[in-house]
Design a protein with these regions (language model features):
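Histidine-anchored, small-residue-rich loop motif
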Residues: 1-96
Length: 96
């Protein structure tokens, strides 16, 4: 299953009948079990329904950084992103 950014945005936690998805490096994870983190009011709610790769790499919650773009990231930031990717892979099922 592949999701467009528009389709992914429908899984942002605002509809309790739908799961919550976050994408990292183009891979979409079902983070519904982490609803307290990614659901409305959670500390990472801004990532729900989006590809948060750049923001995770930069350890940023800034809307401008919530993007799949890895352009211009430092080696250190890529390493941070890889660590996040490993955490997501270990904790959440891949859906797309």
């Amino acid at each position: 299953m592949e999701l467009t950014p528009q389709q992914l945005s429908q899984y942002n936690g605002t509809d309790p009948s739908k799961p919550i998805y976050v994408a990292v490096k183009g891979r979409v994870y079902d983070v519904t079990t982490g609803k307290s983190f990614y659901g409305p009011g959670g500390p990472y709610a801004m990532f729900a329904g989006k590809d948060a790769s750049r923001a995770l790499a930069k350890m940023s919650k800034n809307d401008d950084d919530i993007s799949p773009s890895l352009d211009g990231l430092s080696d250190k930031e890529i390493g941070v992103l890889n660590d996040w990717e490993n955490k997501f892979q270990a904790k959440y099922p891949v859906v797309a």
